[in-house]
Amino acid sequence: MHKSNLQFDGGHHTISRGLRAGIGKRTTGTRYVTIKSRLVVAVFFLLLTAAFRVTPCLAQQDWIKTGTGLGMEKVRLAVPDFKPSTSDAKNADLLKVFNDTLWNDLENAGIFDMASKSFYPLAIPGTPTEVQFSAWNGPPPNASMLVFGNLGVTGNNVTVQGWLYDVKNLTSPQVLGKQYQDTATPAAARTIAHKFANEIIFRLGGGIPGIAESQIYFVSSRSGHKEIWVMDYDGANQRQITHLGSISLSPRISPDGSRLAFSSVTKSGWDILMYSMDLNRLVSFPKYGGTNLSPAWSPDGTRLAFSSSRSGDPEIYVVDQSGGNIKRITSFKGPDVSPVWNRKTGAQIAWVSGRSGLPQIYTMEADGTNVQRVTDQGYAVSPAWSPNGQFLVFAWTRHYGPGAPGASDIYLMDAASKQWVQLTHDGGRNDFPSWSPDGRHIVFQSSRAGGEQIWSMLADGSNQKQLTSTGGNTQPNWSWK
């Protein structure tokens, strides 16, 4: 028998006891309303809306998997359902929520080889003394790691005990042991599963925190207006944030999760608005005149870049977190839109410019110097920088023009070498990619199934899943953590 060490988590507190762009480029059926900027918006709309296609090109490549942390050998993981530890009537419902959520979180991580439950032995362990190593480390499961535990309801509280065992290590198998306590609700069971999954991913995924508790902000028209919504990373718990009855686009959550910047039509035209997630309401933010679109936070949360036509052509400006100290950092004929910061260094900004004709991706230092063109042809929009600063992902129609085949697809490019690979090949318009905090996943919008919906995939283009289905849903933005 092996000594079991547990960490006890109660609600949101942990006690150790010995034991982790952009402008609305296409808004079909939407009427833009401005006072003095109708022409500028028309230019933006013309620049960033058309239906097109592209031919498939490069396949998945090893340098992508390595750079995104997907290149490591996958750990063979067995995750049997947790067992009930009490006979309370709520046990069955909470166990189902917990077990389904834990499995999905670990499967979605992209770094595990999940052993099929059909291979599991009949004797499922709920505690360490019940583990039969030979039943798990040999055929048919052939697992390297085993996740197991129990859940029990007592009164209004639920307690979950969970372990991660290296079943190849017979002398010291325990990698992780945790105990969680919270109110006995399905939401709490789901939260506990997310927390435990993140712990497992952190331990087995190279010390990179999991994304099971992260959120995705997006635009939805399901209420009759384009409002800002938020959902869990897997598409669950979709809920409305704004109720402005207008057109709101380009939601961008701050790195600390306390503020949400977005573009919206107001009485004065297109403005940048700021929403406090702590106060659950809009807070004061300056108006700059002209058309103001596509806000983007710096990695430290102290600055905001956005596109504004306040001086004529749409240009990129930077302000502090309160909207003051405005500074223009681009100056060239033609629209400059959709800025995004290098998320690792904060020293560079990628953006979309029409200075060469059709929109292309460019990079520059955060002060506007050292401008470099990234894409060399076609129609490229919606850049997003990976958390490690190595990759840019964007929407690209490489062969654009009359008679050109295909639609807009998501591409990934190494920012230094300019090597690129196509991630989507499924027709329709694929646009507005955004990186997960761990750099292993990308969320994007796609019209492949008809209307615009939000999808996610691993950063190598595999495991594509639809997250939304009600109404039109666009412009996703993954939280920073």
Predicted features along the sequence, with ranges:
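Bacterial N-terminal signal peptides
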Residues: 40-53
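Amphipathic beta-strand/beta-sheet edge segments enriched in Tyr/Trp
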Residues: 62, 127-199
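Short beta-strand->alpha-helix linker/helix-N-cap micro-motif
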Residues: 66-133, 150-151
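Residue-level detector of Asp-centered blade-edge/turn motifs that repeat once per structural unit
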Residues: 211-212, 255-256, 299-300, 343-345, ...
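Hydrophobic beta-strand positions that form the internal "hydrophobic ladder"
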Residues: 216, 260, 301-305, 349, ...
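A flexible loop/linker signature enriched in serine peptidases of the S9 family
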Residues: 220-227, 243-246, 263-272, 286-291, ...
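Short loop/turn segments that connect beta-strands within beta-propeller blades
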Residues: 232-236, 276-280, 320-324, 365-369, ...
